[in-house]
Swiss-Prot record:
<comment type="subunit">
    <text>Homodimer.</text>
</comment>
<dbReference type="InterPro" id="IPR007841">
    <property type="entry name" value="UPF0210"/>
</dbReference>
<comment type="similarity">
    <text>Belongs to the UPF0210 family.</text>
</comment>
<dbReference type="Pfam" id="PF05167">
    <property type="entry name" value="DUF711"/>
</dbReference>
<protein>
    <recommendedName>
        <fullName>UPF0210 protein LMHCC_2097</fullName>
    </recommendedName>
</protein>
Length: 451
């Protein structure tokens, strides 16, 4: 390897905040099912602790061996609605507490999979789990929850959409003392993927192996610095530059995933190519888009800039890694991106523009704070809009919205750490109550019939 490439890698890590955002161990709990909930919970705890006992230590060893920061070590499990559904329990909060205890025991910062897949309808387990989400998130620290309410193959389950509006509202109320932090750990999906390493939407799909390692990379600062070097050049050059940079970032993710896999004795799954920002200066997706020539993210041209970025990252990443997966799209979480926060505060970025950007990236309305008096029906209608974009365009879309109790437009909601700070954004004041009240299913689009 040439000296300048070594120096470039060091600079990417030290100055441009290149890191591995997460090493996530996916663990199947299908063999933990039991008619007795207490027995099932013991099996779950035992399996997670056994499989993930060395996860954090191995992550730290790789950090020191290669000098690559690994920000998070996490776990995803089989959707608990499936596992708990085989028991006679009528409340699943105990399962959430078991996951929380296991996460604390092995030292990971989040565990995902308190989830239900209801794109076409509910099972008994789905009903009980979704009902219990607010209490589960209020009574645990590290558990993340997700619900899939639609897919291109099946359409949108509007009964589930309506219920999720109510669940988000109740979760915000029950975690009001932390400004609705529970809602930051709850994602509503359309076309959810089974191998997502990123929280809060990670769960371990039933088609996955017993245990796998998935890696999520991150490097908005690196991409921005690369684009700075081609100022004023045509978009062809910009796309090529992003592609080459994404190749380097993904190569690092592949290396870390393979080494972790060998050290843990667990198969390597995928690298997720998503560019994930943090609130730190120099680690913003918004600033990449602005470097392309936008005065501020949210102005006209933002969606086109995001399209170029997203596509070029995928093209570069696919060449660098044998198995890519997860969400693999730019993340635009408002509270976790310094450039997004500033754009909202300046009035350049609103919910409608973020919804348009969802057509490009994976999680469009992400870490959005809305006024505390926003109704459950309005939240449900926001979910329906996002799900529709995903279902029609055959892609993953999601909503992570926080109706922080007692807040009004312009207030700031503080979460701290990687979750950052969210300015409370205005929502459309006109009602969607009668629309959401209809329930039923929005049929799958005509182009979903591929067989």
């Amino acid at each position: 390897m040439e000296t300048n490439q070594i120096l470039e890698t060091i600079r990417m890590i030290e100055e441009e905040k290149l890191d591995i955002r997460t090493i996530t161990m996916g663990i199947s709990l299908l063999d933990c099912m039991d008619g007795d909930g207490e027995v099932a919970r013991k099996k779950i705890y035992q399996k997670i602790v056994t499989k993930a006992r060395n996860l954090v230590a191995v992550g730290e060893a790789i950090e020191s061996e290669f000098g690559i920061p690994i920000i998070n070590k996490r776990i995803s499990v089989t959707p608990i609605a499936i596992i708990a559904g085989s028991s006679a329990d009528t409340d699943y909060v105990g399962f959430a507490k078991t996951l929380d205890a296991a996460a604390k025991e092995v030292g990971v910062n989040f565990i995902g999979g308190y989830s239900a897949l209801v794109q076409k309808g509910y099972t008994k387990g789905d009903e009980i789990l979704i009902r219990s989400i607010p209490q589960a998130l209020a009574q645990t620290e590290r558990v993340c929850s997700s619900v899939n309410v639609g897919s291109t193959r099946t359409g949108i389950n509007m009964d589930a959409v309506r219920q999720m509006g109510e669940v988000i509202k109740e979760t915000a109320d029950l975690t009001a003392d932390t400004q609705g932090l529970g809602c930051a750990k709850l994602v509503v999906f359309a076309n959810a993927v089974e191998d997502n390493p990123f929280m809060a939407g990670a769960f371990h799909g039933v088609g996955e192996a017993d245990c796998v390692i998935n890696v999520g990379v991150s490097g908005p600062g690196v991409v921005k610095r690369a684009i700075e070097k081609v100022k004023g050049e045509p978009f062809d050059i910009v796309a090529e530059t992003v592609k080459q940079t994404a190749f380097k970032i993904t190569r690092m993710g592949q290396l870390v995933g393979q080494v972790a896999s060998e050290k843990l004795g667990v198969p390597f799954g995928i690298v997720d190519l998503s560019l994930a920002p943090t609130p730190a200066i120099g680690d913003s997706v918004a600033h990449i888009l602005e470097e392309m020539g936008l005065e501020m993210v949210g102005t006209h041209g933002t969606t086109a800039a995001l399209a170029l970025l997203n596509d070029a990252v995928k093209k570069g990443g696919v060449m660098a890694c044998g198995h890519v997966g997860g969400l693999s799209g730019a993340f635009i979480p408002v509270s976790e991106d310094a450039g997004m926060i500033e754009a909202v505060q300046q009035g350049a970025l609103n919910l409608e523009k973020l919804e348009a950007m969802t057509a490009i990236c994976s999680v469009g309305l992400d870490m959005i704070a809305v006024p505390g008096d926003t109704t459950a029906e309005t939240l449900a209608a926001m979910i329906a809009d996002e799900a529709a974009i995903g279902v029609i365009n055959n892609k993953t879309t999601a909503v992570r919205v926080i109706p922080a109790s007692g807040t009004k437009v312009g207030d700031m909601v503080e979460f701290g750490g990687l979750l950052g700070t969210a300015p409370v954004m205005p929502v459309n004041g006109k009602s969607s109550v009668d629309f959401i009240a209809r329930g039923g299913r929005i049929p799958a689009p005509i182009h979903s019939f591929k067989n």
